[in-house]
Amino acid sequence: MNGREHRRGDEAARREARSILFQNQDRSIVLIDVPTSIEEAQASPEEVGCDAGPLRKRRRLISSEPPHLPFKTPEPKAGSGGLTESVSDLMIAAAATEALRVLQESYAGPFCLPRVTRPNPLKSAFVPKGSFFLHGTVSSERDRFAAEAPVFDLIVLDPPWPNRSARRKQRNYRVADSLGSIRETLSLIPIAAHLAPDGLLAVWITNKAGVVELLTGPRGLFAQWGLEQVDEWTWLKITTSGEPIVDVGSTWRKPWERILIARRRGSSRKPACRGRVLVSVPDLHSRKPNLRGLFEDVLVPSNKGLEIFARNLTAGWWSWGDEVLKFQQPEYWVES
């Protein structure tokens, strides 16, 4: 079966999430529409897989205009020296380049679905069926979480890693002051007590080397939580024409973010697909694709998931963060 044949053409494919625009045969390369993945997360997986339910009313997420051309990014002057590509960056660049090649050769459709960019506010914030949220910081809600939260098959962390460019842009996007301060915050989360024996932890990370060491080092947070890294995924951001938003060989800026996946030590659980490359046309700043549909093997049949530092809700999941209702607010949605 080639890539074109694998696009949704048969009955099974039609029941897949609309947000998955393409995936190759071994599902190692996935083209995912960011806003649609969040729209689908407002309903249960069963409702997403059929024509009935809330999605039929097409509650739409307000999005930014998708980028049509790559971003301009400065590069060091020739001969400036001092900057070299890490082995990790070279490996990710190779995987990203291969994903772009597969898409070019095997996929002929659009790289993102039509977006709603004009607001038409609803009367109140939307809370998906079966969702539960803690609206507050890790420190303020920790005791309540420890007392009330169940164990989860999947925990997703999207920490506010230190980011000078985010602070410069002043997008009302809160980031930590330093790696030390974010480590202190993450150490407060009782991951070990609330991750199921065969559960997985997925952590969005930046490309800063210190972030990986903070999590995976001998004295890192994974060790503190009794976990071990089992996989790494890449989220590759592209334009509407399929080009990376910046060149994959750029020195100062990379067109990808990464997801580290960990399990309990001694567990045999692994993601169904290893080393995945998720490919998307990006949306609003800090808005990432919802991962629920990509971890079906972990979540079925329980759908017991948790997202920490969440900025939107997911049906059937717990969500926790001081901006947990941000993208559930009326100004971000319309019905069509």
Curated annotation (Swiss-Prot):
Gene Ontology biological process: methylation
InterPro entries: DNA_methylase_N6_adenine_CS, MT-A70-like, SAM-dependent_MTases_sf
Region (Disordered): 61-83
Broad EC category: transferase
Phenotype of the disrupted gene, per the record: Drastically lowers the m6A level of APHA mRNA and reduced its expression. Significantly decreases the methylation level of the ZAP1 mRNA. Exhibits a growth rate defect and displays an irregular colony margin. Leads to a significant decrease in sporulation. Also significantly reduces virulence on chestnut stems and red Fuji apples. Displays more sensitivity to both oxidative stress, osmotic stress, or cell wall integrity stress.
UniProt superkingdom: Eukaryota
GO CC terms of this entry: nucleus
Name assigned to this protein: N6-methyladenosine RNA methyltransferase MTA1
Native species: Cryphonectria parasitica (strain ATCC 38755 / EP155)
Upper lineage: Eukaryota, Fungi, Dikarya, Ascomycota, Pezizomycotina
